[in-house]
């Protein structure tokens, strides 16, 4: 198995740092980033390690955007409900 170079390690560390930052980005930014990830993966120009890192980032962005959409859906349902004292509850995904 080939040994990882310091350049690939640097790439991994940069990606990990960027992934951590994704936790606080807006839905629109996350969706745009996800589209960029898909474009890079579909290009076929990434090394295996880069592709795996991008795939991992894409999964995290997908989970984040799905959670945001589900929270928005819950909010809309409550706003449209006939119950005047309905409250928003923290939303959790079953897979987390």
Curated annotation (Swiss-Prot):
One of its GO terms (cellular component) is cytosol. Its EC number is 3.1.11.6. Residues 1-10 have a biased composition (Low complexity). GO terms for molecular function: exodeoxyribonuclease VII activity. It is an enzyme of class 3 (hydrolase). It is found in: Cytoplasm. Gene3D superfamilies: Exonuclease VII, small subunit. Residues 1-21 are annotated as: Disordered. It comes from the Bacteria. Belongs to the XseB family. Heterooligomer composed of large and small subunits. This is Exodeoxyribonuclease 7 small subunit.
């Amino acid at each position: 198995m080939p040994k990882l170079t310091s350049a690939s390690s640097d790439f991994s560390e940069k990606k990990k740092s960027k992934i951590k930052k994704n936790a606080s980005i807006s839905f629109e930014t996350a969706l745009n980033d996800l589209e960029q990830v898909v474009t890079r993966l579909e290009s076929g120009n990434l090394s295996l390690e880069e592709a795996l890192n991008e795939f991992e980032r894409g999964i995290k962005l997908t989970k984040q955007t799905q959670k945001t959409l589900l929270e928005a859906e819950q909010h809309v349902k409550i706003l449209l409900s006939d119950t005047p004292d309905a409250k928003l509850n923290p939303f959790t995904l079953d897979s987390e």
